[in-house]
Amino acid sequence: DQQIKQVADLKRDKKIVMSKEQRMSYIMYILLSGWDTYTLSLFSEELNVSKKVISDDINSIFKEFSKYNIRINRVAGHGVFITGDEFSIRRAMKSYCKYSIGNKVIREASDNRISVEDQELWINNFGQDNFEKSVEVIHYIEETYGIAYTDYSFKMLADYLCIQLFRVRMGNVITEDIIPEDENIKYSDIVDKVVEKFSSLSKCNFNEYEKQYIEILLASASVQSNTDLYKAISSDKEEKD
């Protein structure tokens, strides 16, 4: 519902003028979010450009999406839509959804390892509750295991977890193995606790493949070598609260 409202709000602003990059990001967001009712005419009307311009944009997007094995389908009389595996769609969302769909303004980041601009982007594109629950889970991991993620890893986790919750709540779940059978990441004990916490916060159920998604994220994340930094981050958070 929040996503529909955000797009509806953007539709009302007919004076908005976008660059090609912004237009493509908007179209990518609509397609990757699972909308299948958008025609070239509708994109043309909303973005105040010709159908020829939209067609050229979609051709450019086709080349980008092919890097993730995502196909753009154009059926006469129907909307433009994509097909591809769920894991690839999430990776593409992280790469290409670079402009805010909503207009919520953030004055201060909730953690000093992420920028106001990034937090604003995630909240406007993937929902404030999804963002807040994702950050709460990361803080839970850090507090439970006495670690502190690096700035880059904290940002990566927040982004991907936010996208995961956004997709799962829309009914788009991973349905196949994304970790090869011969690869053992050995994070299963931590993952179980994280999934339990995430499920409790979000009221969502995560299947075995969604657990693999979290396992990959945790295995990719790096922690600060200085444990005193973790205490400083925790102290800073308490002062802000």
Q: What do the PLM-derived regions correspond to, one by one?
A:
Residues D1-D241:
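A cross-family "folded-core" feature that marks the main globular domain of proteins
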